[in-house]
Amino acid sequence: MGIRIFQVDSFTANPFAGNPAGVCLLPDPRDERWMQNVAREMNLSETAFLVPLPDGFGLRWFTPAVEVSLCGHATLASAHVLWEEGLLEPSETARFHTLSGLLTATLRGDCMEMNFPAKREQPAEPPADLLRALAVKPVYIGRNDLDYLLQVDSEETVRTLAPDFALLRSAPVRGVIVTAKSESPGFDFVSRFFAPAVGIDEDPVTGSAHCCLGPFWKERLGKDEMRAYQASARGGVVQVRVEGERVILGGRAVTVLRGELLV
């Protein structure tokens, strides 16, 4: 019997938008090499692997190149699959044991909410190659344990960035967030996320980046709840609520593929 696997578009209500993630439902744990090979075969920004535990699910995330310690859109996709496939009741909380600790998700109508750790940034001096790769003059530069964050002067600057990914790959971090205050109705801020160092030139919609963006924009906008747009080619909407050292990320998802792994 094959292993059930899904492709889910996260942070969108429409197929072919948002960020696609693979979700693999494992009856038993598999070794890292096998999971990495599956992620490479799926060739999505992340593939999630779920294993049932007595008090929830073990959850690991792999890009086509490496395992990562935190991934928002693949967590949203995982929760979506558990509810849609009837593995959890709508009233049940999804509990995920991960490299970033216990993460939870709840269903609120047609929207899912995930409880993630805040990833606050501190002012930082970036490598010269990073600024050359982006060819921008940021108004602020910060860094946390995962990424650099660069605030730029306008939404247009965010949308028109054309990074040199070969140069950007040398940055000693998972990725680079570029953000600005939104000039579009209905959104508080916009961003893009680049992570060539882990095999993803540009991630379409990045939940984990909003664990940094939420606290960052809360301080500047004076708001606990915000609506964010990630301005990639596919685009996606993230609801963000900051609660102390936790960030609640909200969004929708749609399954576009169901299948079986035969290996």
Language-model features: locations:
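Active-site proximal loop and beta-alpha junction motif in alpha/beta enzyme cores
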Residues: 1-70, 76-263
